[in-house]
Amino acid sequence: MKYAHAPFVGGHRVSARASILVVLALLAFAFVPTTRAVPPPDADPFYAASVDLGTHPAGAVLRTRSIALYGLPLPVSAWQVQYRTNDANGLPIAGMTTVLAPNWPWFGPGQRPLLSYQIAEDSLGSRCAPSYALRGGWDLGGANTYIDTPFIAEALRRGWAVVTSDYEGPESRFLDGVNAGRAVLDGIRAARALAPDGVGPASPVGGWGYSGGAFATLWAAQMQSEYAPDVQFAGVTAGGIPADWPAMVHGVDGGTQAGLAMLALTAIAKNEPNSGVLELLNERGRSNFAEDVNACGPDFVVKYINAHVDDFAAVPDVLSHPDFRAATDRQELGGGAPVTPMYLYHSTTDNVIPVAGFTDLLGRYCAQGADITSVHSTLPGHNPTAVGEAAGAMGFLADRFAGVPVAPGCHGR
């Protein structure tokens, strides 16, 4: 890829092409299988919730362990942290997060920044959890974690500490915005309580996620002022943003990414048994639901290549059925605007998430007074944009961590 002009980041010219090459080079380290036996979360007592879970405040650290980090070729310390959070119904659940900190001093201003990075978990089973993959649990279900590892590595290389939570929770609730947002915010609280080297109460906090990770990031940002006023973001970046779920699932239905439509349908039926969505499936659909109820996103993609969702439904055009639409409406972003500066980006030719939903979300956020730098990227497609626009996202965060002021209001780039 060629760029006529390199962007300015923090007052310095940065080559976007060079940043892409660095990310791709780091990516090579993330795909070497480990020989260590790592038990999956369901077989690991460390993940089990304690009986006194409800006596702890949200964000409280329940237990920690140092781990050997998998796939990051940098001198860093890493911990798995179990913490108390709340599900969408306000009930206490045991969250799990991975906290990473560089093994060298922070030389920037103030305390070491803390980046909350949300991996696109996109799954229905605990073996798909980022914490399992980052510890070396080699499973196809962790593919998104392995793909996102280079972005985490670049944050660490810059000297930032990173917290990345299993924001779907112990029940692996994909497509549950409130559940995800609370888990992210409480994961940040837990990371600050752990206080890895250089991280303290005054550490600036940032949020970043792409695709499914953007969904969790923005739900957390929307909920922050009400749910966690003590967690104030210096800035948030998000790209490939899931907005307009019906358009998304219709767009991939029948194609190579049809499994994502089946993932969304299965998640709604699993998360909301009273929604009526399960009753919309035919016998074949119910049989597959039973098979897939704990599957990972990559499992769905492989299994349902070129499938049509209506082949598994008892009603025509199930993705437009009022029961399904009502359930997905509850998961749409934009009900409230984050109070932190944001850098939001999306490919105009995104082949997974149509750009129209992104443009509409920008309009809703801006109408509510948000401060946004937006990018309608000309990079082709969903995955290339994740890499190609990473330099701009990280530059925005670096400026916010350095205290560089941002122009108020909404601005396109």
Where would I find each of the regions flagged by the language model?
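Alpha/beta-hydrolase active-site loop
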Residues: 147-150, 174-196
